[in-house]
Amino acid sequence: MIIKNGIVADPASGLYEHMDILVKDGKIVKIAPDISCASDAAATEKEEIIDAAGMIVGPGLIDTHVHFRDPGFTYKEDIHTGSLAAAKGGFTTVVCMANTKPTVDNVDTLKDNLTRGKQEKIRMYQAAAISHSLKGQDDVDMAALKEAGACGFTDDGIPLTNAAFCYRAMQNAAKLDMPISLHEEDPAFIKNNGINHGKVSDALGIYGSPSIAEEALVARDCLLALRSGADVVIQHISSGVSVDIVRTYQKLGARLHAEATPHHFTLTEDAVLEHGTLAKMNPPLRTEADRQKIIKGLIDGTIDLIATDHAPHSAEEKSKPVTEAPSGIIGLETSLALGITSLVKLGHLSMLELLEKMTINPARLYHMPYGTISEGAAADFVIFDPDEKWVPCEYASKSSNTPFTGMELTGKVKYTVCGGNVIYSDK
């Protein structure tokens, strides 16, 4: 395969210029200004050629936070449809969460998921639970789960309310050099999850979920991260104060990482009034001031990861009243475009800075040999037109629960390549 005429964007090296890429046996073998079948002895006349003129060629995107709902909830999504959605969105690697049924808290369930994931065209990693059955009480065997292939640990979807248990889990993860990711919402503060406590919840006649519910646990866990030395990920950060807390503890030396989702840096709580349950998620969309602080955190590097929290639900579930419908939206197929639309086109981040948070940063955190375009590296690419406008309307995901349907976005994935194979083409 030869990818020609595109701008190669590699955040790991800072490369951002017109280059061709020669791929052989799933690896990048040459990056040069002009590679042709005739001039390069390693190429043959049968080479597949992708003309990337007018496009950017970036490393295959990596999402550290997806829910494929498999096993147990496959009416919402499964490993196959989730992988198709990932490929359509430019993602070649994903990290699946552990809140399935059964929970990924044991070696057998972990190995089953990983075995089925290997049948797909993307690279599927699996995080294991921190606690048995996500109850926040009993330790899992982290060492055995790491040995069996877990890439990290998380009880995502449910917060760890016991500080001593959380601290012990961080210490154990640190010994194994494994990241531990935390869902930060203290249920003691929350009456109605998924909607911010504020003007919108008041208009709906409900109490909602105040930002202090997140901030209190973020403050606690940033301190525990500092003391434990663990790589701690604050998942789907939604509060501006939470961003400030993370920044403060990073300066103190804590090995803290933070995820921002495209919905939290694009939308505010007002979206609930327009889109109803399609804009309901945990943690909820908050105020414009919170959104601006999340963007500031992305700009200064406090937030080093952009992750989707891809959370499919059925149309029947999302059609329930706002207090009864489940929280969460799909995100794999719109993530890159939302980053371009909300961050790059508005001048907040450069294209390399956006891609850094979606490729090399997650790869380094999870010790993945991906996320870069360099000779000898895996031939994983997202090839996209940064200026093409489009409107999301049909999805490869089994579900379609998103407020972004019908919204004009800029930046369209044209090809996704994983291991030297085209796994998605916009044709």
Sequence positions of predicted segments:
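N-terminal metal-binding scaffold of metallo-dependent hydrolase/deaminase domains
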Residues: 1-43
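Divalent metal-coordination and catalytic microenvironments
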Residues: 6, 21, 26, 54, ...
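Active-site metal-binding motif and surrounding structural segment of the metallo-beta-lactamase
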Residues: 36-57
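Metal-associated gating/positioning segment near the N- to mid-region
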Residues: 53-117
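A glycine-rich helix N-cap at a beta->alpha junction
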Residues: 115-130
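Histidine/acidic residue-rich metal-binding segments in metalloenzymes
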Residues: 137-306
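His/Asp/Glu-enriched, well-ordered alpha-helical/loop segment
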Residues: 203-231, 278, 297-300, 304-306, ...
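C-terminal cap of metal-dependent C-N hydrolases
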Residues: 321-324, 378-427
